[in-house]
Regions:
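Short, surface-exposed patches at the edges or C-terminal ends of soluble domains, predominantly
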Residues: 1-270
Length: 270
């Protein structure tokens, strides 16, 4: 009978582990809790949830921003940049443009469907761009592989497509209609502010494509308050809140100990 009880307990533990693993992962693009190809679970980075008192000289990554910045947060970023901190904004949708304007930057993200013949894949949206600017982010690197980046205007160009590139407006994978070959900038900088038109460089499937770039970026902080690295999964958010709230973690630990204490108390009374 005791052996059967242990077998049932083992099955319950395995089932519970499977349910926990399923409940604490997500398929949301760019999420730190997404272990799939389009998640960022494998990107080595420390999340920050407030822009106040960022460490001087650190590098802050704002990845695929999807939330507005308050005037106070813009002020924190200005102070951070002025103190020698580096900010890298990776955006392909143009959501970063209001922040760039508030920071007084002339850089803008122009969404589109950049494609190129400078590739070794059948997909015209997956291609190599040339390093054309001098920055520590691309030190020792000649080309970077990108995945359907947006065009970046203004600032000092850092990454540029080959001449055999075009904005594939009709999505047919070929130069047609009014489309023409041209070069396009996909990354530019102004001082310590850098804007990259391809947030997918940081997803799990792309990390191995540009290892030197990822290495040059380290160590890096991620702005978890405005980036799409979070999740809408309530279970994951609850667990994250407990981990970040010492009082809640201590309370749960106490609740976990209570049954054990009660069990040993009963044995002592018996």
């Amino acid at each position: 009978m005791q052996r059967e009880a242990w077998a049932v307990l083992l099955v319950l533990l395995l089932a519970g582990g499977a349910v926990y693993a399923h409940a604490t992962t997500t398929t949301e693009e760019y999420s730190r809790y997404n272990v799939g190809w389009n998640g960022t679970s494998n990107l080595a980075a420390e999340e920050v949830r407030t822009l106040h008192d960022l460490p001087p000289g650190a590098t802050l990554l704002i990845l695929a921003p999807d939330r507005p910045f308050t005037a106070g947060e813009v002020g924190y970023l200005r102070t951070f940049l002025d103190s020698g901190g580096r900010v890298l904004i990776a955006d392909e949708d143009g959501n970063a443009n209001p922040l760039l304007a508030d920071l007084g930057s002339a850089i803008r993200v122009r969404p589109g469907n950049l494609s190129s013949l400078s590739r070794d894949h059948t997909d015209p949206g997956l291609f190599n761009v040339r390093v054309v600017g001098n920055t520590t982010l691309f030190a020792g690197i000649e080309t970077v592989r990108v995945n359907r980046p947006a065009t970046v205007t203004g600032g000092d160009p850092l990454l540029e497509t080959a001449i055999l590139s075009w904005d594939d407006t009709d999505g047919d994978g070929h130069v047609s209609g009014s489309e023409t070959f041209r070069t396009a900038v996909v990354c530019a900088s102004e001082g310590n502010l850098t804007v990259l038109g391809d947030p997918s460089l940081f997803v799990n499937a792309m990390l191995a494509e540009n290892p030197e770039f990822i290495n040059n970026l380290q160590p890096v902080l991620i702005d978890a308050a405005h980036s799409r690295t979070g999740t809408t999964n309530p279970i994951i958010n609850a667990i994250a809140w407990v981990r970040e709230t010492p009082a809640a973690a201590a309370g749960l630990a106490g609740l976990a100990v209570l049954p054990v204490a009660w069990h040993f108390g009963r044995k002592r009374d018996d």
